[in-house]
Amino acid sequence: MATVMKKVDAVIVGFGWTGAIMAKELTEAGLNVLALERGPMQDTYPDGNYPQVIDELTYSVRKKLFQDISKETVTIRHSVNDIALPNRQLGAFLPGNGVGGAGLHWSGVHFRVDPIELRMRSHYEERYGKSFIPKDMTIQDFGVSYEELEPFFDFAEKVFGTSGQAWTVKGQLVGQGKGGNPYAPDRSNPFPLEAQKNTVSAQLFGKAATEVGYKPYNLPSANTSGPYTNPYGAQMGPCNFCGFCSGYVCYMYSKASPNVNILPALKPLPNFELRPNAHVLRVNLDSTKTKATGVTYVDGQGREIEQPADLVILGAFQLHNVRLMLLSGIGKPYDPVSGEGVVGRNFAYQNMATIKAFFDKDTHTNNFIGA
């Protein structure tokens, strides 16, 4: 029989970026907030200690900060006629494990959403006609505009300590000839920090791209180009271009993470609690099956715990949020044959493209620098 804990105002499942942001917002609103993280407690110190963290075998090969898919994984199939098989090799998507989640091991690339992406169906129908999009394509508009989201993007960049060069600010051109992105949407403020310096290889690429007519620009990154203190009082140090970003804890406190940028502001609060090693099994519902009443989880000792709450927020990795909703009987599961249902519909992930470049033997790219 499950042990029933004292009720809280809000329980958050997962403590990555989503969980940390929601915890800060809700505690500021005066709510008693409990965050449940299925993995262990981890932080820049001591888990990111130098030189132990500069260990490619532990992090790049054995993938210490990622979900251990030998213990738990998802199944994958390419069509409804295929047999669903367990994913046994991390590749496209990289769920995190432990406090910070994927926000601890990400690289720090910090683009804003393009306004067109928020109204993709309307954009293409206006441009190419309503018959352009295939009937079986489920693409749809988000229902929120870039203009509505812009103030939140602006504040998030201040929290993250994002480095970059704006193209326009309040309609005024400020980034031409300075590495700004001519395709970026307008901004209400410049980036909190100037863009990172370009390495020799980046300079070579930029020169070559410009010569053939492209418009290279400085990547916006949540990797600080200088010392920085965010609105929550969290301090960050300048990036030293070590190259151990994606898949690693940043020992320089230069890469934004929930652990560096938000957790220090939450720890002293009397209305916040973080419980690691708390693996949520399901969201509990009332008798009408339309309202969440809390969650049930298993703690580090294997005990089943029921945590009542007025508000339940699913802030785990996308795949795990959907799985929890399916296990809890929330919403109608998506049926790819009939097209009915919402839960699990429209899963999408980022596209990545790479190129290989060959140089003559007298071209040096400063190979010893990591980033």
Region spans (language model):
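Glycine-rich loop(s) and the adjacent beta-strand/alpha-helix scaffold that form part
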Residues: 25-28, 32, 39-56, 269, ...
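Conserved redox-cofactor binding core of oxidoreductases
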Residues: 59-61, 65-73, 86-92, 117, ...
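FAD cofactor-binding and catalytic pocket of flavoenzymes
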Residues: 78-106, 112-126, 133, 142-146, ...
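A short, glycine/Asx- and small/polar-enriched loop/turn
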Residues: 233, 286-293
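N-terminal Rossmann-like FAD-binding beta1-loop-alpha1 element of flavoenzymes
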Residues: 8-35
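A short, basic/flexible loop-to-alpha-helix module at the beginning of a structural domain
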Residues: 1-7
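Short, solvent-exposed loop/turn and secondary-structure capping segments
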Residues: 44-48, 107-109, 116-121, 228-231, ...
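Conserved N-terminal glycine-rich FAD pyrophosphate-binding loop of Rossmann-like flavoproteins
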Residues: 40-65, 96-98, 102-107
